[in-house]
């Protein structure tokens, strides 16, 4: 499936804006918190792993780590996020 340059630009811009923030600059908990979610699904081939944000964060989120080690926040209630998690667990 081909992705147009405009769609790819939108996805990458959204990913840059939805990167996780550190939970606490001074605490020992290094799990980031997310304040916004990615609006469109990432290409699954770009995702290599995931983790959940800390329970100390105000928003529950899934953080996907891309092949280029970028961290992107996603809404754990979205169907595509759940499908990606299942895929990563099976591989």
From Swiss-Prot:
Keyword Ubl conjugation: no
Location relative to the cell: Secreted
Cystine crosslinks: 33-57, 34-73
Coiled coil: none
Signal peptide: 1-23
GO CC terms, sorted: cytoplasm; extracellular space
SUPFAM superfamilies: Interleukin 8-like chemokines
Domain of life: Eukaryota
GO MF entry, a single one: chemoattractant activity
Tissue specificity statement from the Swiss-Prot or TrEMBL entry: T-cell and macrophage specific.
Keyword field: Chemotaxis, Cytokine, Disulfide bond, Inflammatory response, Secreted, Signal
Family named by the database record: Belongs to the intercrine beta (chemokine CC) family.
Annotated protein name in UniProt: C-C motif chemokine 5
UniProt gene name: Ccl5
